């Protein structure tokens, strides 16, 4: 059953100003740590490989370690937030980030550094699902409708930090060496902890005991889910030479996880809820597909710029920077939209147009024209990110919004993993014009399918704002 709780009476804030700067600042800072760490490492890999005499494949584990851990930890942290209280889990994540910052500064080997990245993945994964739970409960307590602008700010923070992560990593590495990429997490985490204590109210409910808490956390479900993700990822990463036994293990784990979830009173992955809540399940699929295209552009186009036209990494970053900046701005603009359906239709049409533009580029295309041709990719990124986030907010059951938000991020990382596999399959050893054009046509087909599926999905609400604010759930945080 649920976790036994003791309820304390707290002062309910007014609806006006409920999502102001003080309330949003720690949530935004925490939510930025995962995306910035996922990209900041990219410009430090060469220096790390040189210091530890490691190969490209070995240093690649620093990237994969964070992605795999985050894909598993996001829904896990969301589940814990639903059980323990969002503020507690948010703070616990920041403590782990601070610890990782210290450990990374003094890591003696590459293996130790990989474990530091795993620790970073766990710690940074706490912020987003707990932030969604905190926003949901704040709206319930104040009688506010869905905080679309606040959701837009969270999306903007995530997208903007992805854009500046590589540049920030390069600056830090240049100033103090690659260890600065890890050290910087310590002051950021400490600042976040301070802001949480100052501006985020304490959780309203308190767990009565660890034994009853353990009964509410499906450990076996988490282990099976982790195994499913790992084996599925290893299969996708070997698409050039498919590892069929790995696929068989993944399918078997999926079957066992499904049976376990259906037989468990409080499953980690609520298969029954996902099966009955088709709109939420479709949102996960749609978000994974849009992120597949986003990561294809983030990694594929950047690699092609350096291999095809032969630009330096700095110039390649400058060419893609306007696209990333537009994505962040469009996420903020999406926060002002009340609809979910219309922005998603517009966004998927934008992906279709943007993918068509990529078909036109060649190695001889001028840099200024390349900026203009890839710029359209920024607009649908922000709009679709915000709209899908808002969809989860209104589609997920109130008592499971933390877990649901974590699964949304998991679908994002699955999209990233599939994108990496697709790029390896299409690019081979070196990105070429032909490989880039093939990738563009794949994205044209995928975005066209998304347009059709989105237009046909009548479950998407035209109006995102609920008629009545949800009531606070027992055990919710403020």
Q: Can you describe what each PLM-predicted range is?
A:
Residues 158-170, 229, 298-299, 416-424:
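Glycine/proline-centered helix-kink
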Residues 1-19, 207-211, 456-478:
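Intrinsic disorder in cytosolic terminal tails and internal cytosolic loops
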Residues 82-215:
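Helix-loop-helix hairpins in multi-pass membrane proteins, especially solute transporters
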Residues 57-58, 111-119, 177-184, 236-249, ...:
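Interfacial loop-to-helix junctions that mark the boundaries of transmembrane helices
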Residues 50-52, 57, 82-83, 105-108, ...:
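Membrane-helix boundary and inter-helical linker elements of multi-pass secondary transporters
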Residues 152, 160, 174-286, 293:
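Hydrophobic transmembrane-helix bundles of small-molecule transporters
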Residues 93, 100, 116, 123, ...:
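Small-residue hotspots
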Residues 19-36, 41-45, 56, 60-65, ...:
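12-transmembrane solute porter fold
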